[in-house]
Structures are given as C-alpha cells and as structure tokens.
C-alpha cells in the first residue's frame, strides 16, 4: 500500500537542504510517486505540480525541476521515495574502462558471435557534510 506524502512534507524537505544548494536543486523520484504528487494541492487548492508548457520551461513541483528515476523506491511505508538537492554534487567514478570480449564459439552453430562487456563504477556525494541532497522517508506504518 502506498504511503501518502503531504505538501507540508515537501516544503520541509526543500528547507532541510542547505540554502547554498537550493539554486540548482531538483527533486528525484519514481514515476508512480510523480503520479501521486501531481494530485497534491496547497492550502489554497492550487496544484504543487505545474506544467511548464505555458512558460516554455520544464514541469516543476514547488517551483523546482524534477527527474524521474525508475530505480527509486515507490511510495510505501519506510521507503525513501523522494530526494531533493543539488545532484551536481554527486560524483560518479569510472573504476575501469569497458572491457569487451568477443566469443566466437558460443553461438557458432547458429552462425552468430557473442559479445560480453564488463564495466565497474562507483559514486558518492562530494562534500556530503553540508548535506547537498536530502531524502523524504515515509513513516514506517
């Protein structure tokens, strides 16, 4: 079952991030979470999600852009289903070059050639002590 997110929780999430990072900040969540966030309204009944077509800008939530990440957890108890912050502070390290191996024998009887590729990567927040990215965690139940 999906856990609900309120408009006030999103406001608190935005303000939990150091103001120095909010200029380039954006949200990140699963597409199912976006569906639920599009239904949220503020105290005046205005939607938090705003389509950008009228102003030729990307769609926003609370005035911030968002990114859909299908690998993020869906809204459920205990899940960290919404991230907010400056993702340019996330560094991706390529541990090694891509290694490609050609396997002539595997599918030879079918007249085909197989390829096998290896690649290693890692990632971490730079200067994580100043909290450039925060997560909204759903209540456990």
Regions found by a protein language model. Name each.
Residues 1-141:
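Structured, hydrophobic secondary-structure cores that serve as assembly/anchoring elements
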């Amino acid at each position: 079952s999906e856990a609900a997110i309120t408009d006030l929780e999103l406001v608190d999430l935005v303000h939990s991030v150091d103001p120095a990072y909010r200029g380039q900040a954006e949200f990140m969540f699963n597409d199912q979470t976006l569906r639920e966030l599009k239904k949220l309204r503020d105290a005046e009944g205005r939607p938090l999600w705003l389509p950008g077509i009228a102003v030729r800008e990307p769609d926003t939530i609370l005035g911030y852009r968002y990114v859909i990440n299908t690998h993020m957890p869906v809204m459920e108890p205990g899940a960290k289903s919404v991230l907010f912050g400056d993702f340019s502070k996330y560094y991706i390290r390529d541990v090694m070059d891509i290694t490609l191996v050609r396997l002539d024998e595997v599918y030879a009887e079918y007249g085909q050639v197989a390829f096998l590729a290896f690649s290693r990567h890692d990632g971490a927040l730079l200067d994580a002590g100043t909290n450039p990215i925060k997560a909204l965690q759903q209540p456990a139940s």
